[in-house]
Amino acid sequence: MKKLLFTCFVACCSLVLNAQEYYWTTYSFNVEASQVEAVEHLANEYFSKADSKAEGVTVYLFENHFRDNENDWSHQFAFTGTLDAMGEQYSRGENDSWELFLTKLGQYTKSHSAAAGNSLITIGEPGTHPIQNILWFDVEDASKFASAWKKYHSKFNPKDRRMTLGQFRLGRSPMGETHYALMGFNDFKTAFNAGAYRKGNKAAEKAWSEFIEEVDDIVTILRSNTRIMIGKW
């Protein structure tokens, strides 16, 4: 089943990625606040084992902190890696250790949704910023949007944050999202006012206005949420 799902995933991906870009899958679920510590313990116990995942795959556990009432999962596991690494991860087959982990996890959680996609343009180091704001887009002209996005952010993005433009491939919601922007921060102060660095910087302000004007008629923001990294293996 894992091999079949990954084959379908790859068949849906038509863009060639740069070496630093990555594929991802997410599994979102709900867990009561009183049981979060137990879930964290189970995840750490399992994913800390050397044979728990393929080489080159990183697993994250996130808390869905700020979200709308339809995007109402509480936590999420995310698997990321290169195409080869993720292909190996989803070709490993079932094993007793994995099944036992899922059984234990199911005692505390209720499944919500799952999705898959890939990054397109990443500025900064993925996986190093614990607070992540995510904007969900419906993009009509993907090539034009990506070009404008890269032009602005590659020049003006502050060095202490990570910016990724990516695309949803599988598990899209009825809202019809096609792309996302992930902004990684080290603290909430910066995350709360992500555009503060432009204040007083006339070049950045001008470039931002030009970027917005260029993409305004081809992009619709559908949703936003903030997730917090609480585990990484």
Predicted regions: what they are:
Residues K3-L17:
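Sec-dependent N-terminal signal peptides
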Residues A19-W233:
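Short S/T/G/P-rich N-terminal loop/turn motif that feeds into the first structured element of a domain
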